[in-house]
From Swiss-Prot:
Keyword Zinc on entry: yes
Protein name in UniProt: L-threonine 3-dehydrogenase
Residue positions binding Zn(2+) 2: C93, C96, C99, C107
Major place of residence: cytoplasm
Cofactor: how bound: Binds 2 Zn(2+) ions per subunit.
Gene giving rise to this polypeptide: tdh
Residues at the site labelled Important for catalytic activity for the proton relay mechanism but does not participate directly in the coordination of zinc atom: D148
Similarity comment: Belongs to the zinc-containing alcohol dehydrogenase family.
Cofactor: Zn(2+)
Length: 341
C-alpha cells in the first residue's frame, strides 16, 4: 500500500510502498479517507532534536485522520464494517494504575500512532478497537480528520469553569485558535489571544475571539484597559511553548487564576515563581485528550453549533503532500488536510 514514511535520518518525508498492516484479535482496520498534518509531523519532517531522539527510521507517520472500518478482529465488539471513525492516537497499556483507575490519558506506558508505531499517512491503518471513535453522521470528514488536535484544544479549554470568565490564550497556532473558539462557544466573556504571526491572528479573528493581539505591536495592558478589565485574566491557556509568552501570561493573570499548559518549551524555561506563589495561581499540565470524555465533548460542541471550518485553510490530494508540508512549514496556514479518496 502507499504510505508517507520517514525513510532517512534527514529532513524530508517520502512516499513509498509498505506492506498492509496485520489485523490483531482486538484491532480494527481503517481505510483512510482524509488525514491532517500535525505540528508533530512537521517536527518529524524537519528531523529536529526531538525527532532524532524519538522516531525510529523507517516509520509511517501521521495520526490525524478519518476513515472507514474495513475489517474487524474476532474479539471486537461495538464496531461494524462500514463505520466511519477517527481514533485516539495514544495507545495505552491497560494495566498501569492510571489505566485501571480510568485515567487512561495519564498512562505512563503510552505509545503514539505515527510516532512509535505505524501511522495514518497510509491507505490503511490498524489500531486497537478501544482507540476508535465513531463519527456522528452530521459531522463532515474534514472536521473529523482534525479531531485529534481539536481534542487537545478541548481538553485544555475545558480544564476550568469558563462561564463569564476572561480568558487569555498565548499562541495562535491552530490548536490555540480552536481552544479560544471553544472558550467563546461555552460562555467565556472576553477571550484574548496573543501571537506575533499576523496571518494566524487574522485566522483567530475569523473564529470569533474578542481580541487578537500582536504583542510585537500592541501592549496587552492597553488591551485589558480597552476591555474594561481591572483585575487580570481568570483563566490562561498557554499554547505557544514560548517562554516570553508564558511570562507575559503570568503577569496578566488575576490572583487565584487558573492556567492550563499545552505548549511545549524547546528547553528548560525560567519563570518568576513569586508570580505563582503570591498570586495563588493553579497550573495544570495538559497531555493529549481524556479518553474518551474529550471525544464526546468534541462531537457535542460541533453538533451544538461550534464552527471550526475556518481553521482548515489548505486542502490537497495525498499526491500533493509536499505542498501540504510546505504550507504547514511556512507558518501561513491553519490546518492542512490531505485527501486519500
Amino acid at each position: 500500500m502507499k504510505a508517507l514514511s520517514k525513510l532517512k535520518a534527514e529532513e524530508g518525508i517520502w512516499m513509498t510502498d509498505v506492506p498492509q498492516p496485520e489485523l490483531g484479535h482486538n484491532d480494527i482496520m481503517i481505510k483512510i479517507r482524509k488525514t491532517a498534518i500535525c505540528g508533530t509531523d512537521v517536527h518529524i519532517y524537519n528531523w529536529d532534536e526531538w525527532s532524532q531522539k524519538t522516531i525510529p527510521v523507517p516509520m509511517v507517520v501521521g495520526h490525524e485522520y478519518v476513515g472507514e472500518v474495513v475489517a474487524i478482529g474476532q474479539e471486537v465488539k461495538g464496531f461494524t464494517v462500514g463505520d466511519r471513525v477517527s481514533g485516539e492516537g495514544h495507545i495505552t497499556c491497560g494495566h498501569c494504575r492510571n489505566c485501571r483507575g480510568g485515567r487512561t490519558h495519564l498512562c505512563r506506558n503510552t505509545t503514539g500512532v505515527g510516532v512509535n508505531r505505524p501511522g495514518s499517512f497510509a491507505e490503511y491503518l490498524v489500531i486497537p478497537a478501544f482507540n476508535a471513535f465513531k463519527i456522528p453522521d452530521n459531522i463532515s470528514d474534514e472536521l473529523a480528520s482534525i479531531f485529534d488536535p481539536f481534542g487537545n484544544a478541548v481538553h485544555t479549554a475545558l480544564s476550568f469553569d469558563l462561564v463569564g470568565e476572561d480568558v487569555l490564550v498565548s499562541g495562535a497556532g491552530p490548536i490555540g485558535i480552536m481552544a479560544a473558539a471553544v472558550c467563546k462557544h461555552v460562555g467565556a466573556r472576553h477571550v484574548v489571544i496573543t501571537d506575533v504571526n499576523e496571518y494566524r491572528l487574522d485566522l483567530a479573528r475569523k473564529m470569533g475571539v474578542t481580541r487578537a493581539v500582536n504583542v510585537s505591536k500592541e501592549n496587552l495592558n492597553d488591551v485589558m484597559a480597552e476591555l474594561g478589565m481591572t483585575e487580570g485574566f481568570d483563566v490562561g491557556l498557554e499554547m505557544s511553548g514560548a517562554p516570553p509568552a508564558f511570562r507575559t501570561l503570568l503577569n496578566a493573570m488575576n490572583h487565584g487564576g487558573r492556567i492550563a499548559m499545552l505548549g511545549i518549551p524547546p528547553s528548560d524555561m525560567s519563570i518568576d515563581w513569586n508570580q505563582v506563589i503570591f498570586k495563588g495561581l493553579f497550573i495544570k499540565g495538559i497531555y493529549g485528550r481524556e479518553m474518551f470524555e474529550t471525544w464526546y465533548k468534541m462531537a457535542a460542541l460541533i453538533q451544538s453549533g461550534l464552527d471550526l471550518t475556518p481553521i482548515i485553510t489548505h486542502r490537497f490530494t495525498i499526491d500533493q503532500f509536499q505542498q501540504g508540508f510546505d504550507a504547514m512549514r511556512s507558518g501561513q496556514s491553519g490546518k492542512v488536510v490531505l485527501s486519500w479518496d
